[in-house]
């Protein structure tokens, strides 16, 4: 069994006190300790330090209890500490301090700016607390190795666990299994994925807008799950009755067969075009690194063409960008592309900013239905103020190479249509003897076990997971991560003859970036908007990004984006010589004939 939460809370308390001491020294250097004491009516510096250390220790205990200890994850401990410090900055200086002095919090940009020194200190406190926590528990484990559960040898063949899918759900399942069965020889786990990397999909719009490099948001699966066998292969057949799957390791290579005792389906989803061939042929999706890179290069290529275009109709089509779907993905990608194009216009002297046109098509009357009505309206207003057009209550009916046709017959001339209006579960699921919902996802019970099958589990986008009220849980990375952890725990519990646990999860926060350093967020039911929401969005996603190296690279990309224009280098767009220049035979070379 994993170490107790109490132990981690105790070491977190010690680490918090250490981090708090360093923060106290920094605050005292600026003469701010007396302000802390003044919050409860005291004046001495000593009182301020004592109060500060007490709060820091309590916060540290919360860190240890919340994030727990996992060997080999010092980078995650630091990044979790950074986001934890950011949260305490919001709770403390931005919220509780104004309340205690009778002013009330405003969460304004001016208030956040005035508290910038406190922000820096809290981030350093969180990072050092995370590092201290990891170092303390690691040292304790080395000094007292008997606190770890001894290795358990199998009485017979090990239980074979096959996880199909290397996205958030599949990797979360694998990582949790590594923690639960690292010393247990009764289990043998294998992760199978067509890609050898975990893609951080929430950041794909920033790759498409040239704000981040593609490789910076992808982490090698072998690095994320170092103690699990990994197979880079596609699965083209699953035999549920005989507990085996057929693998295709690569083009031209022979098929392989693999047997399992427990199967985890984390196959994700694919774009769903509602049966329209025209959408399949003429729109851009945003599900993979290749999709994001292709869209980026296309946008830059049409800017290059528009800068030399003499036909006003063609130029209008080239400079019109349409996004279909007003959820998180559609809203974020249109905001990011707006920032990209307007931020690089100085490179294109023959394109005027007023010629750029951005249109979002959404079938409902409000965008971002996951947010509260107030934040949804705020987001709509902010994007409209920037010049983005919205056609709400409209549906796309067809697409061509130079236009999008709506259900009311309206035709929008454009060379760029981005589809975020719907996904469907992986088509492989339709070959299984399982009940599927309307979007092709497998129905599972409350334990995330496929209905009617005791040894097959499903999660993430390919599973129909219902909340206690019978409504489907949102298809988000947060839910996939939680589901992956629970599936791992339930598999181990089932093998051990224990009762599996039902899935219950309430998201701590919802975040959306609106471009131009603006965002909207709901954290524990509390709405945030503007610059503070944008900071929260970036802080959360940075903390969730796997691997310290990737976190540092993304952080530097963000910093550079504040100072420099975005990169406009085309990396894969073919040079269309026939479209831009006449052939040699058609040209007239005076004096050579």
Stretch-by-stretch model annotation:
Residues 483, 488-593:
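C-terminal, flexible cofactor-proximal segment of oxidoreductases
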Residues 163-164, 258-268, 396, 404, ...:
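Short hydrophobic core segments
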